[in-house]
């Protein structure tokens, strides 16, 4: 609740390892007016590429300080995930921990800033907030990666309908979401914050030498980003006589698959996986 003249806001996020949503959240936190807001950040773990970029004014609430969960719990999690029962794993192993951590806390607004587990955790602590928002960053109709965290599509829809507003980063994400869920909740589009000043400053930190015309792409190496299509495009350019480099900055679960695809298409000299870079702007 409001403390003095300050509004209390809680952000719920799985982690700050990497990814566009995580970077967006950190940028937002670094642009708050902390004379007007008290901000808490609920995280599973306090680690990741962006964890140290959270401003000191933000109070972190960490669910699990030990990232090495007991062997039995890990085995149960894998088994339940395999059989599509991961929500019940969260319900059994995590729900009470979250409720206990947040006991006595009161907020003007609670925001689950990512789809999936963040929304599930948010649904456990509705009594702690007056207003509830949830962010959707992707096309869930075509890439419904979150369904494993819920009992069913109906359950996931119900969690979204517990919110006062569902926020989307684009009209396309909003339209595809409504194709999937058709929620009655208020929906809004808020485009991603771009911290232009920081981008310009960091772009001048050092100079990168390019040997030829270069196309640089930045993003997580996951199916939704469709970097496999970029590799096929690179093959078309090379086949048509263009001497061109493609740099792909980012890490993710598809790194080995994309690396094999690059090798199989004989593009090792043209397409380069550069991994995660703390400064991708240079």
Regions found by a protein language model. Name each.
Residues 6, 13-16, 31, 35, ...:
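Conserved nucleotide-sugar phosphate-binding/catalytic loop shared by glycosyltransferases and other
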Residues 41-48, 194, 218-222, 245-258, ...:
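Glycosyltransferase donor-sugar binding loop
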